């Protein structure tokens, strides 16, 4: 079960390296980015089977996002909504330091040459070979197939009486 963002590819590889590191925080991620970039076998080929469409895409990362941001604060899914019954499949086509830095700004628009977003209700995602997979920041292992759908029932969360949601 994923509440936030999961992905296949280079970010999951980064999380795998980070989990085995002695350094934590942003500095730890920065240090682990070097072995990740040099040891990963990207780009990867992804096949996304949705209800009425089939997509075959290449990229360095395929994210499954119901929320907007990674834990690092990178805003990778600015149009994502938690309450619309859909999630976004984000295919990051290449590594671009400029575009990665751009995601750290609140209202940054995503460049279609960098990332492609597909908004869907359910999907079966397959890869040619097992690829690193993470769920909500936890490395799960390598996977060739991932099945994704929005759960029918909502998760109940306790909030203060005076809580006002940020969206309607």
Where are the predicted features?
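Long C-terminal subdomains/extensions of small-metabolite kinases
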Residues: 1-168
């Amino acid at each position: 079960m994923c509440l936030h963002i999961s992905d296949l590819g280079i970010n999951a590889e980064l999380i795998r390296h980070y989990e085995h590191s002695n350094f934590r925080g942003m500095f730890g991620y920065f240090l682990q980015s070097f072995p990740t970039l040099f040891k990963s076998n990207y780009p990867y080929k992804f096949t996304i089977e949705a209800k009425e469409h089939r997509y075959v895409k290449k990229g360095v990362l395929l994210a499954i996002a119901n929320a907007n941001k990674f834990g690092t604060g990178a805003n990778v899914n600015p149009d994502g909504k938690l309450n619309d019954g859909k999630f976004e499949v984000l295919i990051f086509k290449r590594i671009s330091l400029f575009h990665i830095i751009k995601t750290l700004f609140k209202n940054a628009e995503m460049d279609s040459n960098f990332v492609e977003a597909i908004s869907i209700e359910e999907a079966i995602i397959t890869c040619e070979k097992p690829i690193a997979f993470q769920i909500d920041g936890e490395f799960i292992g390598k996977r060739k197939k991932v099945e994704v759908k929005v759960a029918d029932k909502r998760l109940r969360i306790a909030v203060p009486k005076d809580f006002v949601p940020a969206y309607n």
